[in-house]
From Swiss-Prot:
CDD domains, per database record: SufS_like
Cofactor: pyridoxal 5'-phosphate
Pfam families: Aminotran_5
GO molecular function, one term: pyridoxal phosphate binding
Enzyme kind, highest EC tier: transferase
Native species: Staphylococcus aureus (strain Mu50 / ATCC 700699)
Origin superkingdom: Bacteria
UniProt KW keywords: Pyridoxal phosphate, Transferase
GO biological process: cysteine metabolic process
InterPro entries attached to this UniProt entry: Aminotrans_V_dom, Cys_dSase_SufS, Cysteine_dSase, PyrdxlP-dep_Trfase, PyrdxlP-dep_Trfase_major, PyrdxlP-dep_Trfase_small
Catalysed reaction, written as an equation: (sulfur carrier)-H + L-cysteine = (sulfur carrier)-SH + L-alanine
Modified residues (N6-(pyridoxal phosphate)lysine): 229
Record protein name field: Probable cysteine desulfurase
Protein role: Catalyzes the removal of elemental sulfur and selenium atoms from L-cysteine, L-cystine, L-selenocysteine, and L-selenocystine to produce L-alanine.
């Protein structure tokens, strides 16, 4: 495919789940921020694994065990190359972004945060990037601080500089907000954190599916993301950590494979990355994630970004034209492919239920971001999000459904 374009109709053919009707209408799936759909190419490698070489890894010398080990470790190398990490030891497979962040909070955080230290986050964070740091602050009697947001839900460089100081030990921030679509300047925030001797842990769950990642350029100390948001299987995530940090960290789960030697009363740990992967790992899921990465790379992230930006701007303009809709977050040209909104006098769950009758799937609720909902002065919102298999036809279907919803709820019975 061309570097800056792709045929969306050909892409759609790869996703069998999209070839169905919901409530008698064509499915317009606009909820990829929660979970993306999975192409046949990924489904095929999963089937191939279970049919041909399903076995445990690292332990067996038989053929199936060797094939499974090769597939699993090749997946690690695919991820390493995808994010431009220096070393394969820097790639830890986890259950997802939440597990990755918790690993950092418990292992690095417990060892390095002391009473009186500060942990810096923002109010736009997903609960998975607030609650682990809340709990760490409580365990250590440290202070949790929040970088203020602008009226558009973005971060101002001066506010960042004023919040991060020499007491800061950890800065935890989303690369892209799962609610507002705000894209944060991780490289600049990392520079500020490092100037004060702090480390930065990035929630990349919403960024990895949509943009090319470069750990050398970004200089994040830890970076977490999930497979199920980027065309891969559920139950698989990645923690990138700088090797020199991971080497000093203690595991937080114990069992098979992560050990070097076990005696009756003591144990030593395996080398990286195995010491953080206790038990039977997520073999099929890792192999599926690697295929999802290859699928996205074949399309090209420049093309993905360009296409998603066009969809987002189109949707933003069409939705803005509906009287009574309030859209939250940055302007249309400074946001990722997510639009969070409310329809005047209609509860978001009613909006989501109503548009579902027209075949449109959107998310409704607090989106695991209750502090952000409080900041927005709402209890919940509706959210539409876009990916490589969406089209303007999907957006038009949403717009028509929203207009019908508005008309229905404005009718006086």
């Amino acid at each position: 495919m061309a570097e800056h374009s792709f045929d969306v109709n050909e892409v759609i053919k790869d996703f069998p789940i999209l070839d169905q009707k919901v409530n008698g209408k064509r499915l317009a799936y606009l909820d990829s921020t929660a979970t993306s759909q999975t192409p046949m190419q990924v489904l095929n490698v999963l089937e191939d694994y279970y049919k041909r070489y399903n076995s445990n890894v690292h332990r067996g010398v038989h053929t199936l065990g060797s094939l499974a080990t090769d597939g699993y470790e090749n997946a690690r190398e695919t991820v390493r190359r995808f994010i431009n990490a220096k070393y394969f030891e820097e790639i830890i497979f986890t259950r997802g972004t939440t597990a990755s962040i918790n690993l950092v909070a418990h292992s690095y955080g417990d060892a390095n945060v002391e009473e009186g230290d500060e942990i810096v986050v923002t109010e736009m964070e997903h609960h998975a990037n607030i609650v682990p740091w809340q709990q760490l602050a409580k365990r250590k009697n440290a202070t949790l601080k929040f970088i203020p947001m602008t009226a558009d839900g973005e971060l101002n460089i001066e506010d960042i500089k004023q919040t991060i100081n020499d007491k800061t030990k950890i800065v935890a921030i989303a690369h892209i907000s799962n609610v507002l679509g705000t894209i944060n300047d991780v490289k600049t925030i990392a520079e500020i954190a490092h100037q004060h001797g702090a480390i930065i842990s990035v929630d990349g769950a919403q960024a990895a599916p949509h943009m090319k990642l470069d750990m050398q350029e970004m200089n994040a100390d830890f970076y977490s993301f999930s497979g199920h948001k980027m065309l891969g299987p559920t139950g698989i995530g990645v923690l990138f950590g700088k090797r020199e940090l991971l080497q000093k960290m203690e595991p937080i789960e114990f069992g098979g494979d992560m050990i070097d030697f076990v005696s009756k009363y003591d144990a030593t740990w395996a080398d990286l990355p195995t010491k953080f992967e206790a038990g039977t790992p997520l073999i099929a899921q890792a192999i599926g994630l690697a295929e999802a990465i290859r699928y996205l790379e074949r399309i090209g992230f420049d093309a993905i970004h360009k296409y998603e930006q066009e969809l987002t701007i189109y949707a933003y303009e069409q939705m803005s034209a509906i009287e009574g809709i309030e859209i939250y977050g940055p302007p249309k040209d400074r946001r990722a492919g997510v639009i969070t909104f409310n329809l005047q006098d209609v509860h978001p769950h009613d909006v989501a239920t109503a548009v579902d009758t027209e075949g449109v799937a959107v998310r409704a609720g607090h989106h695991c971001a209750q502090p952000l909902m409080k900041w927005l002065n709402v209890s919940s919102t509706a959210r539409a999000s876009f990916y490589i298999y969406n089209t303007k036809e999907d957006i038009d279907q949403l717009i028509n459904a929203l207009k019908q919803t508005k008309e229905f709820f404005s009718y006086e019975f």
